[in-house]
Regions:
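Outer-membrane beta-barrel proteins
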Residues: 2-181
């Protein structure tokens, strides 16, 4: 039901979208709805900040979800750095390294994520990302994660984002609103 309402809201505002800029921005704040494997719902905040024209950017995020039918919360936060290397006027090769922390009802796990991917602008209003990551932590074996995402920009500042992460242990879906600057 929640997904249907989100999809309906997105479709309703698409005709009113203004022309947006096609420059890829690595400075943004974002609020997301989070769905973990269809078994947990929650919300999150993410952001990034470009360090001038160097190609480097800092990134961070926090999300929380409650497992359906329980009072068990899953909290995660990450802090890291990334680098974007232009491979064409509308596409960047990106690499990221981040520290991750996950807390499930008092069980804390520290880890890291190393990612490489491509982010590109398909049109002035639409961009996509494909990323491969290796994630490892204290008490678990490492895992590879594939990420596919997109952003539809209403204006140079505002856009709607969606992302799906696929791993051996499950999927994570996010839909949110992004303000780029």
């Amino acid at each position: 039901m929640k997904r249907s309402l989100l999809a309906l809201a997105l479709v309703a505002v698409l005709p009113f979208a203004a022309q947006a800029d096609d420059k890829l921005s690595y400075s943004y704040v974002e609020a997301d709805y989070v769905n973990l494997d269809g078994d947990a719902d929650g919300y999150g905040l993410r952001g990034a900040f470009e360090f001038g024209d160097s190609g480097f950017y800092g990134l961070g995020g926090w999300r929380t979800a409650e497992i359906d039918g329980t009072n068990i919360d899953v909290d995660q936060w990450e802090l890291g750095v990334g680098y974007a290397h232009g491979i064409s006027p509308n596409a960047d090769l990106i690499s990221e390294l981040a520290y991750d922390k996950v807390d499930v009802e008092g069980f804390d796990e520290d880890g890291y994520r190393a990612s490489v991917g491509v982010r590109g602008s398909f049109s002035p209003n639409f961009e996509g990302i494909a990323k491969a990551s290796y994630v490892d932590s204290d008490d678990t074996d490492g895992d590879f994660v594939g990420t596919l995402g997109a952003q539809y920009k209403f204006t140079q500042t505002w856009g709607v984002v969606g992302e799906a992460e696929f791993a051996d242990g499950g999927e994570l879906y996010t839909v949110g609103l992004r303000a780029s600057f």
